[in-house]
Amino acid sequence: MLKFTIPLPPVTKKNHQQIIVNKKTGRPMVIPSKQYKQYEKECGWFVQGKGLKINEPVNVKCVYYMPTRRRVDLTNLMEATHDILVKYEVLEDDNSKIIRSVDGSRVLYDKENPRTEITIDKAE
């Protein structure tokens, strides 16, 4: 079991995107915003288990404590978290063969201490 906390206000990847034009092809491309890239970089300081590259079935439970009561898409938050776990090599990949479930994941409110609590357990 691996459990750790990222003491930063959670940021979604999809709600913070930029559209740019590829200089070579002239086609529009969607890239993460500077805000998301900064969040991803700062998360690296708090992610535990870097380099584990877990490749067996696991349950990834994420509890997001948001700074406001605004509605937020849990799926987008989890997608951003899974991408960060793959980037920092905690998980080998974020496909369904490795992340079997996200049971228990939810969004709560904590104005004073926004954070993300992540628990990774072996899947049964």
Roles of regions detected by a PLM:
Residues 1-124:
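Acidic, proline/glycine-enriched N-terminal capping motif
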